[in-house]
Structures are given as structure tokens and as C-alpha cells.
Amino acid sequence: MVDMSNVKLRIENIVASVDLFTQLNLEKVIEICPNSKYNPEEFPGIICRFEEPKVALLIFSSGKLVVTGAKSVEDIERAVNKLIQMLKRIGAKFQRAPQIDIQNMVFSGDIGMEFNLDAVALSLPNCEYEPEQFPGVIYRVKEPRAVILLFSSGKIVCSGAKSEHDAWEAVRKLLRELEKYGLIEEDEEEEW
């Protein structure tokens, strides 16, 4: 049985796509968005930064958004609601609630033990390890779909998950594989 008690995960970034279901006049929107940039010759949307919650939004005339930099799903919801309130002040009409779809969550974490990455790479299926190019094992989980970067220190980065539950499940699958191939050292009692 895999022991997850020492595993720590922290959200570093969430990316979401949002549909406001309304067309936007970006020339008007740029006037009400502080900390924003709009140069249609370079990019077809507004790049807007909120300080609270601390996120960046890409706003398109189709009413579609990309929100990035969030540390929680609640931050995304707060940012979208804040933008909607701002848009209402310039006459934007909303017929329905926005649709928010999480596209990617990135977690950093620590498994709480060290690993011989050469042994991991030789034993584990679905992984890549080229230490001359990158100092970690790249482990791909098929279901839930995620990619875990495993470093010799036991530190990990998990990306591609669409929920916190999926990230934990992906890490659980990695640990099961490590255990299955005898790559998890049992804690040995130190003798004094």
C-alpha cells in the first residue's frame, strides 16, 4: 500500500478558458481595464492583469477569455466575476452565467524521499530521462492525464491535471509504480 502521508503538493498555476457568451468591443474594454495592453496588430486580444486576485486575463472580442496565474479555482471565479462587473459598467449584456473550464493545473511538491533517477528510468514504463538535457525523470500518466517531473531530491512538478484530485491520483499512480519496481526505500531505523 502506497503511503501518501509524506507527500506535499502545492498549486503553482491554474489556466482556465472562459466563455462569457457575449461579444465585446475591445476598444471600450481597454478603457476600463487597468494594467492592460491592446495592440491588435500584434495580438487580437487584450492582455489584462489584476492585482487582486493576482491573475492575467486574455480578453477576446468573441467574449472568450483565458485566465492564468491563479492559485485556486476560487481566484479564477473571482477574476471572472470582477471582469463581468467592469464590463457591465460599459453596457455589456450577459444572458447566462459564464462557462469556466480548467485547462491545466501545475503543482509543485515533495514525495519526501530521494531517488536514483537512473534506476527509475530503467524500471519505469512511460518515462524519459536524459540527464544531459534535463535533471529530472519525465513520467507520463495516462489516466488521469498528467505529466510528473521527478527529481532525485524527491521534489516533483505535476502538470496537465484538470483538478487537484487528478494531480493527487497521478502522484499516487507514480508512487505505486515506484513501489512495484522496488524503487521506494523503506525507512530504516537509524542506530545510535
UniProtKB/Swiss-Prot annotation:
General factor that plays a role in the activation of archaeal genes transcribed by RNA polymerase. Binds specifically to the TATA box promoter element which lies close to the position of transcription initiation. The keyword Repeat applies. Pfam families: TBP. Keywords: DNA-binding, Repeat, Transcription, Transcription regulation. The gene is tbp. This is TATA-box-binding protein. The lineage of its organism: Archaea, Methanobacteriati, Methanobacteriota, Thermococci, Thermococcales. One of its GO terms (biological process) is DNA-templated transcription initiation. Coiled coil: none annotated. The keyword Repeat applies. GO terms for molecular function: DNA binding; DNA-binding transcription factor activity. Sequence repeats lie at residues 11-87, 102-178. NCBIfam families: PRK00394.1-2, PRK00394.1-3.
